[in-house]
Amino acid sequence: MDNEEVNEECMRLFFKNARAHLDKHLTSRLTCDENAYITFRCFLDGIHRKSTRFLEELLLKQENMYHNNNYERINDSVIPLVLKLLWLQIHEPTLQWFEHWFHDIMRLSNRRKFRVFRIFQKKMIQFFKITHRYYYDIIEHLCAKYDMNSVISNALFAKLNLMQYTDGLSTHEKIILNTSNPLTFSIVISLQRCVINLGSTHFYKTLLNKPSNKPKSVEGFEKSIRYLNIASLYLPAVGDTYFQRAKIYLITGKFSLYFFELVRGALVRIPSKCALNNLKDFILTPDFPERRRLMKKLAILVSKDLKGEKSFFEGQIVLQFLSIVEHTLVPQSWNASRASNCWLLKEHLQMAALKYHSGNINVILENLAATMGSFDLMFTTRKSKEQKNKLKYADLSERQVFFLDLSFDFIANIIDVVIKPSWQKNMEDFRYLAIIRLLMCWIKSYRSILQYTHRHRKFCTSFALLLNDLINSPLNCSGNIYSHRPKRSYLFREDIIFREFSCINFALTDFNDDYVYDSPDMINNIIGCPTLTKVLSPKEECVLRIRSIIFSGMKFLEKNDTGVIWNASKYKFDLISPNIKIKRQIALSEISSKINVKTQQERVVSSRKVEAKRDEQQRKRAGKIAVTELEKQFANVRRTKKLSPLPEKDGVSSELVKHAASRGRKTITGPLSSDFLSYPDEAIDADEDITVQVPDTPT
């Protein structure tokens, strides 16, 4: 085959035909006929050789274009597409066929079960090793051929045992990947796709490794999670990584983490359609299998009187929250027999959180992220993110305001009962203050939420009291308040967890991170593994978080309309009764020397200076490679269709209502077709010829 023949259409046709042949191989004969299995192995080897040839010819073709300065002809998406199609059309259907065979074996009598399982395990492990070796060979080939030191941290290569490829050939023997090289995007995406597929392959191996239906533990999926964590550090904007992790947490009954990973996978720069559809089903469809599984688990815990168990707390929190969101988004799906009083549900949720929160702060953080994601889903899905962010509070529908009422009542109680009494006793646990950082960045990302919270007295009061504690904490030197965002040299754990989260405009922005991104060590700084500066102790990181929250909080409360004012003489916020008309607000001059409060004219001038400085910073960074730049480019390449917005009715997508009524019972392992066109798949367009269908398994 000539180089010119290797294109997207050619590859799609090849894998479509290969899939048809695969379905003929995956029959009951494969389970008992050794010759049939040998034939299947030969077929698989042929597919791998053909796929490798595709990759080699495409790489050579694009390298020639690069050397000839013919950059405009380089196709960024075609090489990652080979790996995506190979997984969707060959490897994943085969692993799903093994999964169906496994479930058939579990229904056999014990004596026959173990005999058949030995046959099954031998063939499954053989397929696993072949698949695993294939993806690792591609990774090693790419690392041996390209110098990625400007793109990917050596810490990530070390996690993959690939350090020999970073120190081997001299620079002139490799093609250097950086911002100016148009090959960078394609190679980095391909590398990440291989790592995701390795994680997914280990998921199936662990799932099918023992002849038992006993519940699986998260620890058993350690290797799968390790690969997926590495993939999310490579490119956190790719939603498929989070969806694959969600599958693990579903299997192990970690519903809070399952919910959280679905939100992350659905609301990133390059979202996963499977994550989005499963998220909507989990929220809006009471009969969705995962909802029923959660109910069954809770019933077992209650029957065993294990209400104090952490798993009971997680399940109860998730279920109560799902009920609130469902009631808010699709109220017509409720009736009197299902406790239609949503405020009662809210009270149950708050009681559960406040009673069992000790040692479960991670569930609170995950629930906050789920709250953000649920609010995002309440908008017409064809409305752009920019439009959502610019909507005013007055433009919100009654349902959206109702949801915010429930959410911020709950958040205020969390601040009062969980964060305020406990953060000083748990300084080494980053999640207490991370909740506040995440909350403030969410509020300032939406104009409507910012205006709403400025009017929410309970929230402003709780937040002001927390700020008083932070300002007067021994960790805040001399009770300082700050006129600028604090600086740091690397991203903290919560920054890494929530990178590319669309609900906060893709990053926590309450620090001045110029040094993080302008440093020669940027690729290590953004994954929290700096090599040119020391890693701070938990206490030192806590001090910086306090400064960040104080700065953000002072700016936020400056415009509140709930009677919370700054008392400069006492150095704290005072709470004024809403029944007393305030004739004199505190003079801005009293605190202008302490915090960055300006007149309207000063704000305009300052804003222009900030924008000019930001443009200058971006120009300075033009010569450096930033992973986010690759992610933006990838998103733009794949969004091939522009969609016209539809009118919004009552602020909630009418499609959500249809979705709740029409969704069938689907499992998380199946690729769910999307009814929401504004969330394209992160790597390929949704064509019928790549739908994963599992062939029949033996009875």
Curated annotation (Swiss-Prot):
Biased composition (Basic and acidic residues): 647-658
Annotated spans, Disordered: 641-663
Location relative to the cell: Nucleus; Chromosome, Telomere
GO MF terms, alphabetically ordered: RNA binding; single-stranded DNA binding; telomerase RNA binding; telomeric DNA binding
GO biological process: G-quadruplex DNA formation; nuclear-transcribed mRNA catabolic process, nonsense-mediated decay; regulation of telomere maintenance via telomerase; telomere maintenance; telomere maintenance via telomerase
GO cellular component, one term: chromosome, telomeric region
Family classification: Belongs to the EST1 family.
Entry protein name: Telomere elongation protein EST1
